[in-house]
Amino acid sequence: MSTTTLHLAKQNFKFSAAHFLIFDDKHAERLHGHNYQVRVDLKTPAEKDLHAEGYFLDFNVFKKYIKARLDQWDEIVLLPEKHPDMKFKKTAKSLEVTFRDRFYAFPLNEVILLPVTNTSVEQLSKLLAEDFYREFKGYGVRRVRVYVEETRGQGASSVVPEN
């Protein structure tokens, strides 16, 4: 029995965000940014479960959700909420962040705390894959693979569910 995988890699599947990677207990990158590109692969049900017209679902259903989701991370600072060395204090207008000997203050609407220990492409792709799978499994999507590229030719992908 055959299955089909839909490939979505639109030019507007992108977001620009600032972050820094934490390598170990002494080393971390400086705050910097990337223009990320995203590709999403959706494994559809078996061919017998396609519409009588021979297609799975209108691509626009997926494209709209993916684009809206990526827009949430566009022009924003992404920080790892679960790293033990990250300390956060919310004030009326800002988020104060202490990381080891560094201090930052960001406007509240310009920072997102992610439920991860590092803001690597590995973790970003995993968060997006989990989110897209939760959203799309109701349509019959069997598996989601998300590839996040931070620079041309350099990125990571995650697959949900794994098997």
Regions found by a protein language model. Give the residues of each.
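Charge-rich, low-complexity N-terminal segments
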Residues: M1-N163
